[in-house]
Amino acid sequence: MSKLKLNDVNIYYGDFHAVQNVNLEVPARSVTAFIGPSGCGKSTVLRSINRMHEVIPGAYVEGEILLDGENIYGPKIDPVAVRNTIGMVFQKANPFPTMSIEDNVVAGLRLSGEKNKKKLKEVAEQSLRGANLWEEVKDRLDKPGGGLSGGQQQRLCIARAIAVKPEVLLMDEPCSALDPISTLAVEDLIHELKEEFTIVIVTHNMQQAARVSDQTAFYSLEATGKPGRLVELGPTKKIFENPDNKETEDYISGRFG
């Protein structure tokens, strides 16, 4: 059963056609990796899945993006509700630096009106455990989130994202600023999170895509200034070992990109 489905998706920034005719399905409780050279549109597609690209003036989408069969761009759909259901973890960890670790985790819940202190504490612990961070921070929950290491901050942001109980988690190069040990911790976490969430990750690290994902989507573009496009989508093992498209094979083998 597909959790997400993109039908003939075209993305524009004003007059610029950024991404052309993307069709893909994302199965529930799986990890899908988006790979491809810089400028190919993979992060643009990712951000369109929870309407984050709309914060840029002039950006718009043609086609359908379906979550459980419902178009998230439908006329009666609230973008804020979409972002609660489809969470996002960014490339650079972005905790609220002066806010306590606990308050960082429950910031989204508080914003949506939750005031029950007992529930907030329970959700904070549950989410920190879910992000494999609880044991490292349980004795300093009142300390600022900005005081954590880079890897811990990224896991704190993941805890904050899952605290509002999304159904889908989008990750835009979540390990690009992390050291190898912290990267491994986040990758292990991704494997655990897919038991509960549907995950889509953009990564420039081909080995990471091979390690963490169930299926891989390879994006490319004909030339600078041309729209990005989805070249090939398939099971990760097949994409990396026996792709159907020569362009995919050339990228995977390092002959371009």
UniProtKB/Swiss-Prot annotation:
Gene Ontology molecular-function annotations: ATP binding; ATP hydrolysis activity; ATPase-coupled phosphate ion transmembrane transporter activity
Q: Does the keyword Membrane apply?
A: yes
Name the source's superkingdom. Bacteria
Q: Name one GO biological process term.
A: phosphate ion transmembrane transport
Topology versus the membrane? Peripheral membrane protein
Q: According to its UniProt record, where is this protein mainly located?
A: membrane
Residues in coiled coil? none
Q: List the record's Gene Ontology CC terms alphabetically.
A: plasma membrane
For binding ATP, which residues are annotated in this chain's numbering?
36-43
EC number(s) for this protein? 7.3.2.1
Q: Fill in the subunit field for this protein.
A: The complex is composed of two ATP-binding proteins (PstB), two transmembrane proteins (PstC and PstA) and a solute-binding protein (PstS).
Question: By its UniProt entry, which NCBIfam families does this protein fall under?
Answer: 3a0107s01c2
Q: What is this protein called?
A: Phosphate import ATP-binding protein PstB
Q: What is the source species?
A: Corynebacterium efficiens (strain DSM 44549 / YS-314 / AJ 12310 / JCM 11189 / NBRC 100395)
Q: Report the gene name.
A: pstB
